[in-house]
Amino acid sequence: MQTRHRAKKSLGQNFLQDANIARKIVDSLKITENDSIIEIGPGQGALTKFILEAGPESLTLVEKDRDLAPALEAEYPEARVELEDALKFDWAGLDPDRNWKIVGNLPYNVASKIMWDIAAQCNATCVFMVQHEVAQRVTSGPGSKKYGAISVWIQSFCRTDYLFKVPPTVFKPKPKVDSAVIKFFPLPEEEKPSDIEGLAKLVKYCFQYRRKQLGKILKSFISDAVIQWAEKEGVSLTDRPEALSPLQFQSLYKSVKNDFPS
């Protein structure tokens, strides 16, 4: 798509210029004719043309920039363009009977929030390009210094894979940091947590004090149930939050939910 549109810093726009990387990102999604695709922030259409070439059942482009939407509609009439902020998109309202896949070069300033919402609200395979540091955090496991609230949260709903690193030189304007492409595979519904609001609060609360021991973080909520939880899980209350797996956070919440502030 040819356009003189200047990237808007307020929207975190960095347009991908490398067709080989664009194709590699789309190939990572493994699109079939039965897939309904949502692309977040299509911008100048770097990924869009390769998505359409893959032949999905449908393609929806979620674009916040009203200056770009008309050009996208003209260039890709096969796609439906929705002028909307991905942070306000109704991810939970997607038809559960359709095979959804979501892809996008996410703006650095809102990428974590978008992924947080999508992981919990819809059952979709996703491929996202994000800031390299964020990609490391999302895909890190327990015990890693990169492991944090977003790692626990997204991995409570999805299996995550780090795919490949992307240099700043392939964007216009060039960002100051590296990017990376990651992939989410949704877990079976029966393996996902149920009380997601409570779990989210607990995870965020614990990682606010990530250098403290669990016993000190949870001192107001220590009960026989928590002590039994620690014994059952083989966890010491002298451990720090980064030692707990997503499943252990879920079982911890069940032990403290009656005392934890709603």
From Swiss-Prot:
**InterPro entries to which the protein is assigned, alphabetical:** KsgA/Erm, rRNA_Ade_diMease-like_C, rRNA_Ade_Mease_Trfase_CS, rRNA_Ade_methylase_Trfase_N, rRNA_adenine_dimethylase, SAM-dependent_MTases_sf
Pfam families, alphabetized: RrnaAD
What Gene Ontology terms describe where this protein resides (cellular component)?
cytosol
Q: Where in the cell is it found?
A: Cytoplasm
**Domain of life the protein comes from:** Bacteria
Q: Which SUPFAM superfamilies does the UniProt entry name for this protein?
A: S-adenosyl-L-methionine-dependent methyltransferases
Catalytic activity, as annotated = adenosine(1518)/adenosine(1519) in 16S rRNA + 4 S-adenosyl-L-methionine = N(6)-dimethyladenosine(1518)/N(6)-dimethyladenosine(1519) in 16S rRNA + 4 S-adenosyl-L-homocysteine + 4 H(+)
Q: What is its EC number?
A: 2.1.1.182
Tell me which UniProt keywords the record has, alphabetically: Cytoplasm, Methyltransferase, RNA-binding, rRNA processing, S-adenosyl-L-methionine, Transferase
Which Gene Ontology molecular-function terms are recorded?
16S rRNA (adenine(1518)-N(6)/adenine(1519)-N(6))-dimethyltransferase activity; RNA binding
PROSITE patterns documented for this protein: RRNA_A_DIMETH, SAM_RNA_A_N6_MT
The principal location of this protein is cytoplasm
Top EC category: transferase
Q: Which residues bind S-adenosyl-L-methionine?
A: N14, L16, G41, E63, D85, N105
Q: PANTHER family annotated for this entry? A: DIMETHYLADENOSINE TRANSFERASE, DIMETHYLADENOSINE TRANSFERASE-RELATED
Q: What does this protein do?
A: Specifically dimethylates two adjacent adenosines (A1518 and A1519) in the loop of a conserved hairpin near the 3'-end of 16S rRNA in the 30S particle. May play a critical role in biogenesis of 30S subunits.
Family, similarity comment: Belongs to the class I-like SAM-binding methyltransferase superfamily. rRNA adenine N(6)-methyltransferase family. RsmA subfamily.
Q: Which NCBIfam families match?
A: ksgA (TIGR00755)
Q: What is this protein called?
A: Ribosomal RNA small subunit methyltransferase A
List the source organism.
Answer: Maridesulfovibrio salexigens (strain ATCC 14822 / DSM 2638 / NCIMB 8403 / VKM B-1763)
